[in-house]
Amino acid sequence: MTLNLCVLTPNRTVWDSEVKEIILSTNSGQIGVLKNHAPIATALDIGILKIRLTNQQWVTMALMGGFARIGNNEITILVNDAEKSIDIDPQEAQQTLKIAEANLNKAEGKRQTIEANLALRRARTRVETILESINRF
C-alpha cells in the first residue's frame, strides 16, 4: 500500500501520483508522512517537499506556502506555487537569489523589508531545492 500525493496550485496540478513517503515543511517544522499516517491538516511554510517514489528514488519540489491535508493514505497539498527541482533553471534561480539579496539590502520601510524578506525566502528555497536534489540523490 502506498500514499496518493496531489500537489495543487491555483493554476495547475503539479503532482498527482502514488508515493512511498514525503517530508514537508510546516509552519512548526518538518514532518514525515508514511502510509497510515494519523489524519492532520497543517499550514505549510515556504520550503522543500521531499518525495520518495515507489521505486525508492527521491524527488524534491519547492513549495511556496499553503496547506496540507493528510488522511486515509491521501495527501492533498494546496500551495501558492510549486516547482519540481528538475524544472528549476539553476542559473536563473541563482540570479534571482542575488537580486532578492540586493533588494533586501536596499529596502526602505517596514513593508519593503517584509516583501524583500519573503522574496529572499522564495529564492533561497528554489536554490536549496536544486542543491538538495543534487546532494541527496
UniProtKB/Swiss-Prot annotation:
Cysteines paired by S-S bonds: none
Top-level lineage group: Eukaryota
Location relative to the cell: Plastid, Chloroplast thylakoid membrane
Signal peptide interval: none
Coiled coil ranges: none
GO cellular component terms listed in the entry, alphabetical order: chloroplast thylakoid membrane; proton-transporting ATP synthase complex
Keyword set, alphabetical order: ATP synthesis, CF(1), Chloroplast, Hydrogen ion transport, Ion transport, Membrane, Plastid, Thylakoid, Transport
Keyword Iron-sulfur in record: no
Membrane topology, record value: Peripheral membrane protein
One Pfam family in the UniProt entry: ATP-synt_DE
Thylakoid keyword on record: yes
MF terms (GO), sorted A to Z: ATP binding; proton-transporting ATP synthase activity, rotational mechanism
Subunit structure: F-type ATPases have 2 components, CF(1) - the catalytic core - and CF(0) - the membrane proton channel. CF(1) has five subunits: alpha(3), beta(3), gamma(1), delta(1), epsilon(1). CF(0) has three main subunits: a, b and c.
Function: Produces ATP from ADP in the presence of a proton gradient across the membrane.
Protein family according to the UniProt entry: Belongs to the ATPase epsilon chain family.
Name of the featured protein: ATP synthase epsilon chain, chloroplastic
Organism: Medicago sativa
